[in-house]
């Protein structure tokens, strides 16, 4: 290092530089606790958030509540459902149902579809004829059974998996 660079480094640090080649020094283990680490961890998402400003916390979109009640930030409590139920008396039944749907969406899950016996019978009959129904058949079934088309598609996927599993088990029993 040239004398000018060494002098500049001393001015930046504000203290004379001491060169130590010990493992502790190289790894930075000999630094005092109050010293700031020389390298920052690589967190590209932090740079994006910090450029948005100090109030750039990402929040779950929840419908507005009556009487100026605000929903708590998801990070405030590990279980948002429990926190939301504290405010249960303030909401009508439809608002509570909407809130529960929002919380299910937050967890990435939709409520499980409970098929009636009649719906299952119709779906099983169609499955016996065609285990890979096209979109037109699924939409027709959805209309007749009062279900969403994607629920019917998932039902057929699950039914094919069940059939495959039963074939595998029967092959295992024969061997």
UniProtKB/Swiss-Prot annotation:
Keywords: Developmental protein, DNA-binding, Homeobox, Nucleus, Transcription, Transcription regulation. Pfam families: Homeodomain. Residues 1-44 are annotated as: Disordered. One of its GO terms (molecular function) is DNA-binding transcription repressor activity, RNA polymerase II-specific. Signal peptide: none annotated. Transmembrane segments: none annotated. The keyword tRNA processing does not apply. SMART domains: HOX. One of its GO terms (cellular component) is nucleus. It is found in: Nucleus. Residues 108-167 bind DNA. One of its GO terms (biological process) is pituitary gland development. Belongs to the ANF homeobox family. Required for the normal development of the forebrain, eyes and other anterior structures such as the olfactory placodes and pituitary gland. Possible transcriptional repressor. Binds to the palindromic PIII sequence, 5'-AGCTTGAGTCTAATTGAATTAACTGTAC-3'. Interacts with TLE1. This is Homeobox expressed in ES cells 1.
